[in-house]
């Protein structure tokens, strides 16, 4: 087996391919990507058999920015007979590790998603057949590998597997979040998704705790502030625009009509700084770096708006500059970045300061 499939946002295949090429080269696992614009996935073909499995073990999924999911896979199965689609798939999975879950998926395009109704119907008979052949355990298990069947067209699919300690836990790599009817804007889902992706669920009570203070730069009308308020935090909302009255009525929000680049909290008791400003990405990244280095906040989640061209290069440059700034200032940190499902022409970055710094 020498293919890895990576799901991505349609239109970002080139960035996803460039990133996986860089990561594979660093691991000295050589191959090349195959992409088609707006298909929502990338096929990376390794020169050596077995390198696909090595890659999905050695490459931390959490450090891939543009990939929503990755799994090692067979080459594309085509022309599955309508009267028996199961047998060719069972043949393809010979030699796979025994898996604890089956996901029959499609890429995230309108064309492919038309197949989802079929995928749902096909799941039960394929799961039964796989359990009969001991390809799947008798009971679903979140500790065992995940078996992926990805249909890109009727009768055409990739069959592969991922490891649960190094994949996306979500079907199709997409968290299913419901828009809260009382939220002031749909941007609220970006921050909610970021919490799901960047912060382990068992740490939410400690790191997203009631009573904490947060700062939201470029807050109006309050989509990101809403997420902090919902978790019983207090928020400094920074913007020259108008905040949703429903948020102001909670008594948890202090509004400051000032420029987000000039605001400094009077009391340095802030845990979270969040920012979704429409600004040059390098400028936003540097501002977030300053907040953390000065210990004005302990954790940050912010969006970097991407240019029309050279998106991957811009991301690499901004993140590298930010890391170097932290290193230069002697700050220990943890940094993750992801092109989230609810992001468009932007990526979301999370940084956590790991040392006890005094505000200055």
UniProtKB/Swiss-Prot annotation:
Active site: 305
Assembly and oligomerization: Monomer.
Domain of life: Bacteria
Similarity comment: family membership: Belongs to the class I-like SAM-binding methyltransferase superfamily. RNA methyltransferase RlmE family. RlmM subfamily.
A Pfam cross-reference name: RLMM_N
Primary localization class, coarse: cytoplasm
Catalyzed reactions per annotation: cytidine(2498) in 23S rRNA + S-adenosyl-L-methionine = 2'-O-methylcytidine(2498) in 23S rRNA + S-adenosyl-L-homocysteine + H(+)
Keyword Transferase: yes
GO biological process assignments: methylation; rRNA processing
PANTHER family in the cross-refs: RIBOSOMAL RNA LARGE SUBUNIT METHYLTRANSFERASE M (PTHR37524), RIBOSOMAL RNA METHYLTRANSFERASE FTSJ DOMAIN-CONTAINING PROTEIN (PTHR37524:SF2)
Gene Ontology CC: cytoplasm
Subcellular location: Cytoplasm
UniProt signal peptide: none
Alphabetical list of InterPro entries matching this protein: RlmM_FDX, RlmM_THUMP-like, RNA_MeTrfase_FtsJ_dom, rRNA_MeTrfase_M, SAM-dependent_MTases_sf
UniProt GO MF annotations: S-adenosylmethionine-dependent methyltransferase activity
Its biological purpose: Catalyzes the 2'-O-methylation at nucleotide C2498 in 23S rRNA.
UniProt-listed Enzyme Commission number(s): 2.1.1.186
Protein keywords: Cytoplasm, Methyltransferase, rRNA processing, S-adenosyl-L-methionine, Transferase
Binding site for S-adenosyl-L-methionine: 187, 220-223, 239, 259, 276
Name of this chain's protein: Ribosomal RNA large subunit methyltransferase M
Gene3D superfamilies, per database record: 3.30.2300.20, 3.30.70.2810, Vaccinia Virus protein VP39
Lineage: Bacteria, Pseudomonadati, Pseudomonadota, Gammaproteobacteria, Vibrionales
């Amino acid at each position: 087996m020498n293919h890895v499939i990576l799901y991505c946002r349609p239109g970002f295949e080139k960035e996803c391919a460039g990133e996986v090429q860089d990561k594979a080269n660093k691991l000295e696992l050589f191959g090349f990507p195959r992409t088609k614009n707006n298909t929502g996935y990338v096929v990376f073909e390794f020169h050596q058999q077995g390198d696909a499995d090595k890659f999905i073990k050695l490459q931390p999924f959490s450090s891939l920015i543009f990939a929503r999911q990755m799994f090692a896979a067979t080459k594309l199965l085509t022309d599955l007979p309508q009267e028996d689609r199961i047998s060719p798939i069972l043949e393809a999975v010979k030699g796979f590790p025994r898996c604890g879950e089956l996901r029959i998926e499609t890429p995230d395009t309108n064309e492919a998603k038309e197949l989802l109704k079929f995928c749902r119907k096909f799941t039960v008979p394929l799961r039964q057949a796989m359990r009969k052949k001991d390809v799947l355990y008798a009971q679903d298990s979140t500790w065992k590998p995940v078996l992926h069947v990805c249909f890109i067209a009727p009768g055409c699919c990739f069959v592969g597997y991922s490891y649960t300690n190094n994949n996306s836990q979500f079907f199709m790599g997409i968290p299913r979040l419901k828009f809260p009817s009382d939220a002031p804007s749909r941007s609220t889902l970006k921050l909610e998704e970021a919490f799901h992706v960047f912060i382990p669920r068992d740490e939410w009570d400690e790191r997203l705790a009631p009573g904490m203070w947060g700062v939201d730069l470029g807050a109006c009308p309050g989509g990101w502030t809403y997420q902090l308020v919902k978790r019983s935090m207090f928020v400094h909302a920074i913007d020259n625009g108008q905040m949703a009255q429903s948020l102001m009525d909670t008594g948890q929000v202090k509004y400051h009509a000032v420029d987000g680049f000039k605001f400094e909290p009077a009391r340095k008791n802030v845990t979270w700084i969040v920012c979704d400003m429409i600004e040059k990405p390098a400028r936003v990244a540097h501002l977030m770096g300053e907040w953390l280095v000065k210990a004005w906040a302990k954790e940050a989640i912010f969006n970097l708006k991407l240019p029309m061209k050279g998106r991957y290069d811009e991301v690499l440059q901004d993140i590298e500059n930010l890391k170097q700034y932290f290193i230069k200032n002697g700050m220990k940190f943890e940094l993750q970045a992801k092109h989230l499902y609810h992001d468009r022409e932007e990526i979301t970055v999370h940084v956590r300061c790991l040392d006890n710094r005094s505000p200055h």
